[in-house]
Amino acid sequence: MKNKIKFFLILIFVYSCSLDTKSGFWTKTEKLNNTKTKKVFVEKKVLDQEFNTQIKIKLKNKNVKNSFLNNNSNNNGNNNFTGSFKNISKYKFKKISNFNNLKPELSFTKNNSVIFFDNKGSIIKFDENSNLEWKTNIYKKKEIKLNPILTFSNNGEFLIVVDNLGKYYAINITTGSLIWSKKNLAPFNSQIKILDDKFFVVDYTDTLRCFSIKNGNEIWKSTSETSLIKSLDRVSLVISDNEIVYHNSLGDLVAVNIKTGNLIWQTPTQKNLLNKNTFTIKNSDIVLDNNSIFFSNNENNFYSIDVRNG
């Protein structure tokens, strides 16, 4: 009973204190000084004004147009395209997986035919009127399930094909029949360049390989420094006189002798690049114009490099 009385008295005391406004026990207040506020994230303003309105750019009247066929410089020149499509046709085929990263391209022939492939690795050739000339597929069922990505180049007689499974082969460009087929130890991830009776391609080990068009035998190979983590970006190549130039997975630009594969020069383009960052690097195709090589990347870098010495 005594405990209940004590509890009741304590409760009355606390309650009476909470109602007290004169003693200052509960009413003591403190005024806060006005503090300055600063925005951490400032909204970006879109500029809608034109810069350098007085600058005039004069373009040549004559367009310089280089052929798309077996273009070993990746330089198509200044083309005038009206944007008009007079004839449009459609052909349905299986959607290509990972299309954006691997950037597969069409292959064109001298008689305006177009060559492409579908998600099963079938190669399809159309004439200039969109009529199907031939369709061929050399892959086995287990390979088709892997959705091979093909890369093409042709010299008017042979269609050279490499893929991301490590296969490389030659197709008769007129009939679509297989001439020879071989297997590389590593998948390919580059453009193909053809010169005379040879073709050149880079695989995922950053090895540039030179093969015979006639039978697919390897003539020479040239290795460069590589990264542990590989980018999905396709490697670009150009041919200049006696050398072939490409960029490896580290972002280095590499030039080798086109006859022997011996290193001529190697120029790094990335400073303190960690292996984990090489996966995100994406380079444009390298373009050769006279003695200069031009290319850019997704790190907001643009390069002009002398092809003679790097």
How would you name each of these model-derived features?
Residues 2-11:
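Sec-dependent signal peptide recognition
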Residues 118-119, 163-164, 196, 203-204, ...:
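Structural signature of WD-repeat beta-propellers
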Residues 33-49, 53-89:
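Blade/loop signatures of beta-propeller domains
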Residues 11-48:
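Bacterial Sec signal peptide processing site at the extreme N-terminus
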Residues 127-131, 172-176, 212-216, 258-261, ...:
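Short loop/turn segments that connect beta-strands within beta-propeller blades
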Residues 89-108, 132-156, 178-196, 218-241, ...:
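Extracytoplasmic beta-rich repeat domains
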